């Protein structure tokens, strides 16, 4: 789990990025108990435990930097676990990466090409069981078009938000063995569908993560 805003960081206060990747068992024991909460946090929660600090995300969207760090983590993992199930990278975003270089032809625009190239490099990282899979889910408080697992970029070209196309290009094509199982999560995905939801609602958000982390996909 990595957070990114003005910086890329571990949202788990007890586990620094330098210790990633981490096991589920380590994550399970890394919570902060109610005795460790600040007075402000105590006023805002009814839970006696907390795993994720959500208040550290602010400002920019340093997606390029985040994916650069994730690539190194995935590479290190695959070297140590060549026979494991391929890594799955799930990215939650509310908009366009803004740590990209300026477009050489239009200085008012950002150039997403370095991010596309980086994602393609990540997708090529593989174990003996297959390649890394990248999924993207976009969230917004603006009412707009909901797009689930588009097969063609034509399905999102009418969306004015440039992040719609960027996230499409970043996403992996859903592996064929996953398609039939997708119906069990309420998704009807055609062959060639991208592992990507734009302007997700809450139900789709939950199903996206259950689908993407389902152990029966292995």
Which positions does each model-derived feature cover?
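Acidic, low-complexity intrinsically disordered regions
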Residues: 1-218
């Amino acid at each position: 789990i990595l957070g990114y805003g003005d910086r890329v960081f571990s949202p788990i206060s007890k586990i620094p990025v330098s210790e990633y990747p981490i096991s589920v068992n380590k994550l399970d024991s890394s919570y902060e108990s109610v005795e460790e909460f600040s007075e402000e946090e105590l006023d805002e929660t009814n839970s006696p435990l907390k795993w994720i600090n959500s208040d550290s995300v602010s400002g920019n969207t340093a997606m390029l930097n985040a994916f650069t760090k994730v690539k190194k983590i995935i590479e290190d993992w695959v070297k140590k676990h060549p026979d494991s199930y391929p890594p799955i990278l799930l990215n939650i975003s509310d908009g366009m990466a803004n740590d990209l270089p300026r477009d050489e032809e239009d200085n008012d625009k950002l150039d997403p090409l370095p991010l596309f190239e980086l994602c393609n490099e990540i997708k090529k990282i593989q174990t003996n069981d297959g390649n890394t899979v990248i999924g993207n889910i976009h969230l917004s408080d603006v009412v707009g078009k909901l797009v689930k697992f588009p097969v063609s970029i034509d399905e999102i070209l009418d969306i004015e938000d440039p992040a719609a196309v960027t996230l499409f290009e970043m996403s992996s094509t859903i592996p064929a063995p996953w398609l039939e199982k997708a119906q069990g999560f309420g998704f009807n995905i055609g062959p060639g569908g991208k592992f990507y939801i734009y302007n997700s609602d809450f139900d789709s958000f939950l199903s996206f993560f259950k689908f993407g982390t389902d152990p029966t996909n292995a």
